[in-house]
Amino acid sequence: MFLVKMVLGFLIFLSPLCATGLDISQTDIIERSLNFLLFAGILWYFLAKKLRSFLHSKSLEISKRLEEIQAQLKVSKENKKKLLKELEQAKEKAELIISDANKEAYTITQKYELQTKMDVENLIKNSKALMDLEVKKIKRELVESVFKDLRESKKVSFNVQDCVNILKQRL
């Protein structure tokens, strides 16, 4: 097929020469053309299989390399998807940890606020009770000192019933 195309191309190339009125009897163009066509045909006959096998091996090499690159690309894409999935999971886990920490901090804060409030209330109750005791103690001491002063002074005289009433009121 290739040889036929070459012959047709050569004839088309020679057609302008045939159209002119030149005398080509003195030239050896036809012999040279035939020699060239024979040389090209022989060269094609011997080199065609080697050239085809060389080109075929190169195309196989290129396709093999392309397949390797595509496989690497596929692995890279899968790794990327896997890493993105892990990243999303890590973000979700971090958000969960942060929310748990916030909840725990809030719970601890509430616990200490409640404990502090209870401690303050207990301190207030204890201080009120202590103040009441101190007031009673001071009243008792005052009543005792006044009673003692009155008993020691001879100006006032008490009978037993009056002493009992005073002591009852004191307590």
Curated annotation (Swiss-Prot):
UniProt xrefs under SUPFAM superfamilies: F1F0 ATP synthase subunit B, membrane domain
Keywords noted in UniProt: ATP synthesis, Cell inner membrane, Cell membrane, CF(0), Hydrogen ion transport, Ion transport, Membrane, Transmembrane, Transmembrane helix, Transport
Coarse class of the protein's main subcellular location: membrane
Protein localization: Cell inner membrane
Pfam families membership: ATP-synt_B (PF00430)
InterPro entries listed in its UniProt record: ATP_synth_B-like_membr_sf, ATP_synth_b/b'su_bac/chlpt
Membrane topology: Single-pass membrane protein
One Gene Ontology MF term: proton-transporting ATP synthase activity, rotational mechanism
TM region(s), chain numbering: 2-22
GO CC annotations on file: plasma membrane; proton-transporting ATP synthase complex
Function: F(1)F(0) ATP synthase produces ATP from ADP in the presence of a proton or sodium gradient. F-type ATPases consist of two structural domains, F(1) containing the extramembraneous catalytic core and F(0) containing the membrane proton channel, linked together by a central stalk and a peripheral stalk. During catalysis, ATP synthesis in the catalytic domain of F(1) is coupled via a rotary mechanism of the central stalk subunits to proton translocation. Component of the F(0) channel, it forms part of the peripheral stalk, linking F(1) to F(0).
Family stated for the protein in its record: Belongs to the ATPase B chain family.
Assembly notes: F-type ATPases have 2 components, F(1) - the catalytic core - and F(0) - the membrane proton channel. F(1) has five subunits: alpha(3), beta(3), gamma(1), delta(1), epsilon(1). F(0) has three main subunits: a(1), b(2) and c(10-14). The alpha and beta chains form an alternating ring which encloses part of the gamma chain. F(1) is attached to F(0) by a central stalk formed by the gamma and epsilon chains, while a peripheral stalk is formed by the delta and b chains.
NCBIfam families: PRK08475.1 (NF006292)
Protein's recorded name: ATP synthase subunit b
